[in-house]
A protein has these predicted regions:
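C-terminal active-site subregion of NodB/CE4 polysaccharide deacetylases
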Residues: 1-75, 81-82, 86, 171-363
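Short histidine/acidic/glycine/proline-rich micro-motifs that form metal-
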Residues: 31-34, 106-107, 135-138
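Active-site-proximal loop/turn and secondary-structure-junction residues that shape catalytic pockets
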Residues: 32, 104-106, 163-167, 296
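Acidic (Asp/Glu)-rich catalytic clusters
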Residues: 50, 90-95, 144-160, 306, ...
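Short active-site segment of divalent metal-dependent hydrolases/proteases
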Residues: 80-81, 165
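A short, conserved beta-to-alpha structural element at the edge of catalytic cores
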Residues: 95-122
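Structural detector of well-ordered beta-strand residues that form the stable sheet scaffold
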Residues: 99-101, 160, 291, 313-314
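A substrate-binding/cap region within the structured catalytic cores of diverse enzymes
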Residues: 111-115, 121-211
Length: 363
């Protein structure tokens, strides 16, 4: 009984001592009336931050050790127009800071008309259709450089790298299923080159995670023709369908290859350098933080990007960050549909170094 009491007292003391000794980071994407996080809900989050007298800082300030006790990072991925339309006015209203990680392929110089805001899957699919067609993917559903510059000049928003294209790659040739053109999204369009039913679905990851499995695009129609002639409406068992499909894939290895180490490095270096160059050209800032697309991390790519000047890597791994952070993996808590109560609970857990670490371990 006494030992249990002593342990309990020690735990309570540790929780008290380490309260406000962590730097939680929260992750958003879109904030608009049709997203899971509406402007009204986001404002409630800011009110909670204000209620607990927390200091919002940018990722650059965090790295430069400009970190008051009780600090928090607000981060946004991709660079959607609603970040300018809804988020920026609220940050100004509450005098709070944020960091936005940009995909530069989709950003136009100047906006001519204000768009009707769409969900991010629709936005990115439309952009990729144009990219496949013309090689250009600027779309008014993303912020313009004029808007981004206005935000940057306010000193409230830091802008850093999130890759140029934010696309995927195949990592294996083991078939997982078949495409449904009505459900295909931007990464699938990028990989297949067109939206079609009955293309083989292979495992994929973010482009920055390593060496890609390369598939010649003509194979997809060859496979589709084989499937529709020999399997569709003839075999009903799912496992048998996959077995027969895999046998055909394995018989056609000439359509597949794996990137060399040099090809992988070249691809990463070119995409990141373009991302960095465009941001720095438009803002005059220093880009040295990289946010993993989809949170897909790679130790090998960390090494490559460090050679290109990256000093900090931003993940989607839950938990919190100590004031002396692990810059190979800044943890973030993703907010897709957190109500105010859930936001408050996560905030209070993650600003405590001990509780935040436990949260990260069990998540």
């Amino acid at each position: 009984m006494i030992i249990t009491l002593i342990i309990l007292v020690i735990i309570i003391l540790l929780i008290i001592i380490f309260n406000k000794r962590a730097v939680p980071a929260f992750l958003y994407h879109q904030v608009n009336p049709i997203s899971n996080v509406t402007p009204e809900l986001f404002e409630e989050h800011l009110k909670v931050i204000k209620e607990y007298k927390m200091n919002t800082i940018t990722i650059s300030e965090f790295y430069n050790k400009e970190v008051p006790t009780n600090s928090i990072l607000l981060t946004f991925d991709d660079g959607y127009f609603d970040n300018y339309k809804y988020v920026f006015p609220l940050l100004k209203k509450y005098n709070m800071k944020a960091t936005i990680f940009l995909n530069t392929l989709y950003i136009m110089d100047k906006r001519e008309t204000e768009p009707e805001i769409k969900d991010n899957n629709t936005v990115n699919l439309e952009a990729m259709k144009e990219y496949i067609k013309s090689g250009k993917a600027t779309i008014n559903q993303y912020m313009s450089w004029e808007e981004i510059k206005e935000m940057y000049d306010s000193s409230l928003i830091d802008f850093q790298a999130h890759s140029h294209k934010h696309m995927a790659m195949f990592v294996d040739t083991k078939i997982e299923g078949l495409t449904n053109k009505e459900k295909m999204e931007a990464p699938e369009l990028y990989l297949y080159g067109e939206l079609q039913d009955n293309f083989p679905v292979f495992p994929k990851r973010g482009e920055y995670t390593g060496r890609a499995t390369l598939v010649k695009k003509e194979f997809f129609k060859i496979f589709k023709d084989f499937y529709e002639k020999n399997i569709e409406n003839k075999i009903t068992d799912k496992n048998e369908i996959l077995k027969k499909s895999q046998e055909f894939i394995d018989e056609n290895k000439e359509y597949f290859s794996v990137e060399s180490e040099a090809e992988y490095r070249k691809r990463i270096e070119e995409d990141f350098s373009e991302n960095k160059k465009i941001i720095e050209k438009n803002l005059g800032n220093e880009v040295k933080f990289f946010c993993w697309p989809w949170g897909h991390r790679s130790k090998a790519t960390i090494k490559v990007l460090k050679e290109l000047g990256v000093v900090g890597f931003i993940s989607t791994k839950k938990g919190t960050n100590s004031m002396k952070a692990n810059w190979d993996m800044i943890r973030r808590i993703e907010l897709r549909n957190y109500n105010v109560k859930k936001f408050k609970i996560n905030l209070l857990l993650a600003r405590n170094l001990i509780l935040g670490k436990i949260y990260g371990w069990i998540s």
